[in-house]
Amino acid sequence: MELRHLRYFVAVGDALNFGRAALALHIAQPPLSRAIRALEAELGATLFDRGTRGVRLTGAGAALLPEARRLLRDAEAFREGARQYAAGAAGTLSIGFVS
């Protein structure tokens, strides 16, 4: 599973529209649809009901959307921690004073 697929899932889940999600992600709609289908195949669950009246989250999609958001937040926190560590900004700082 790729983080990119989770980002795409969250974008479509928020917009409930593949075209608007694609615009927000700065990608074309067909690759977005393919990525969502690949994610659904990998998970073995349909995330969206696609119909003539638009897109709706399935039960699985509604249950997994908050988890996808959490995973993306955790990945960003990990990435930021790694950047700080690489820059020497991470570590323990102990400060004491004498009165």
Model-derived regions, located:
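Enrichment for repetitive, rod-forming helical segments
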Residues: 11-14, 41, 46, 86
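Sparse recognition of residues in long alpha-helices and their boundaries
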Residues: 37, 48, 77-80, 84, ...
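Core alpha-helical elements of the protein kinase catalytic domain
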Residues: 7-10, 37, 69, 76
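A short LG(V/I)-centered, amphipathic sequence patch enriched
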Residues: 40-57
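Interdomain hinge and pocket-entrance segments immediately C-terminal to HTH DNA-binding domains
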Residues: 53, 83-99
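N-terminal short secondary-structure element
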Residues: 1-35, 51, 55, 64
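Alpha-helical linker/hinge and terminal dimerization helices associated
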Residues: 42-43, 64-86
